[in-house]
Amino acid sequence: MKYTLTRVNISDDDQNYPREKKIQVSDPTKKYIQKNVFMGTLSKVLHNLVNWGRKNSLWPYNFGLSCCYVEMVTSFTSVHDISRFGSEVLRASPRQADFMVIAGTPFIKMVPIIQRLYDQMLEPKWVISMGSCANSGGMYDIYSVVQGVDKFLPVDVYIPGCPPRPEAYIHGLMLLQKSISKERRPLSWIIGEQGIYKANFNSEKKNLRKMRNLVKYSQDKN
């Protein structure tokens, strides 16, 4: 996924959402190759350092919709110890949070509230969709439930399950950290390019299928 952020125009129609305009940009790594060795290496090291700090200090927004939220907060207990990943600091304000977990059923009445909370979060920000209800509406194929959070918010990681176990939430957090480590974001609003680059990752289903095929091939060969 490649896009750039543009300043929000308050006079825009509120029906257009999300307000950020997404424009395709090229992979910045190609431009690094064209630079000299010193500047290219310096830029790469600087981005890696910033991404390392971002992915190891992800503060979640204390927000839940249904039973999946119970499983999410269970990961904060001493049994699972999510502080190992630097995400034990729950924030009561979206302005102090780095990512939002949609844990539960997204009802139509909650959509404008969720969108407003998302708009109050500062960049960089990410969204995790946790559970079948948040991913696709789950068993609620009715008029009052939105069939997937990605209908009104950009989602970075999907966590399957009804409800997912705390281990699944931790695994989703690790996938988000992996995605952040490959991102290229502006170092400042006045330094460098303002484009955002996100690497494309295969689904875990494809990765596991590939691993199973490799194991099966090695067993057949032996």
Swiss-Prot record:
GO terms for molecular function: 4 iron, 4 sulfur cluster binding; iron ion binding; NADH dehydrogenase (ubiquinone) activity; NADH:ubiquinone reductase (non-electrogenic) activity; quinone binding. Keywords: 4Fe-4S, Cell membrane, Iron, Iron-sulfur, Membrane, Metal-binding, NAD, Quinone, Translocase, Transport, Ubiquinone. It is found in: Cell membrane. It is an enzyme of class 7 (translocase). The keyword NAD applies. Its EC number is 7.1.1.-. Belongs to the complex I 20 kDa subunit family. NDH-1 is composed of 13 different subunits. Subunits NuoB, CD, E, F, and G constitute the peripheral sector of the complex. NDH-1 shuttles electrons from NADH, via FMN and iron-sulfur (Fe-S) centers, to quinones in the respiratory chain. Couples the redox reaction to proton translocation (for every two electrons transferred, four hydrogen ions are translocated across the cytoplasmic membrane), and thus conserves the redox energy in a proton gradient. This is NADH-quinone oxidoreductase subunit B. It comes from Buchnera aphidicola subsp. Baizongia pistaciae (strain Bp).
